């Protein structure tokens, strides 16, 4: 995930107090890339970094959630738009369509639509990887 590098850089800088909530969706628990790394970062920085895993199908013992990252999930995690809040999106086209609107051609960000637009975010607060 491209967000791993960003999260890692923020957390290793002791001066940076940015709070991060990672919502990580996958088909199954075995598809979760860098899970142990994210779990370790969450343990090392409990006041600054939180991670929640979402899967379509769970194995026994899975400690995350089964289902999609939908409007209710985003409303419960995001505190709403503010001048200092930013949302970073990475995923397949269906995720972009639902959450933020599709990316534009040749890597352009494209217009903001979907759940984040409904929640009041503007395109300066959302970055699509």
Model-identified regions with their sequence ranges:
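Histidine-anchored nucleotide/phosphate-binding helix
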Residues: 2-14
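Reductase modules of NAD(P)H-dependent flavoproteins
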Residues: 18-129
């Amino acid at each position: 995930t491209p967000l791993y590098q960003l999260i890692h850089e923020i957390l290793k800088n002791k001066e940076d107090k940015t709070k991060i909530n990672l919502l990580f969706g996958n088909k199954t628990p075995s598809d979760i890339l860098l899970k142990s790394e994210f779990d370790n970062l969450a343990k090392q920085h409990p006041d600054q970094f939180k991670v929640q895993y979402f899967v379509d199908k769970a194995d026994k013992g899975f400690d995350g959630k089964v289902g999609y990252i939908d409007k209710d999930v985003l409303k419960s995690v995001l505190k709403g738009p503010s001048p200092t809040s930013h949302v970073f999106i990475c995923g397949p086209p269906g995720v972009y369509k639902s959450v933020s609107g599709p990316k534009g051609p040749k890597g352009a960000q494209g217009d903001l639509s979907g759940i984040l637009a409904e929640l009041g975010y503007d395109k300066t607060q959302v970055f699509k990887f």
